[in-house]
């Protein structure tokens, strides 16, 4: 797979997305990045501590046990007791301006996730996701979790979860 990345920029913030080993990784979300994309990617690459992996590990935005993530997975469910562990791979990457649409596919679980990111001129990031079952049988979805890294400076999160667009403001 060729290296795919996208830089979404606003005067107050930037979002740098990169496909690493088939997973979508948020390399940077915070202060504006300047210069070329290659320099930015090189500058934000984490260092490797002694007695650690040989290369930095990036579990990706889709938290999955198949990629070594030990917490709650992004997609929790099963297909009649099977396909309970997913491994989504980026199958389509579309970037135009400050909009990115990424399609993830797990052919074993027969699921597809489309996640879009939009960064407006004020630096507000909007993320949307849809999950599609393209298999013949039913898929029992227990939970789908959106995940975004928060910068150290963050003191509040704003969540418009659910269909009724209720406002939920949480102190971090």
Task: Give the location of each predicted region.
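Contiguous, structured surface segment used for ligand recognition
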Residues: 20-21
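Polysaccharide-binding surfaces and accessory modules of carbohydrate-active proteins
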Residues: 4-7, 13-15, 25-172
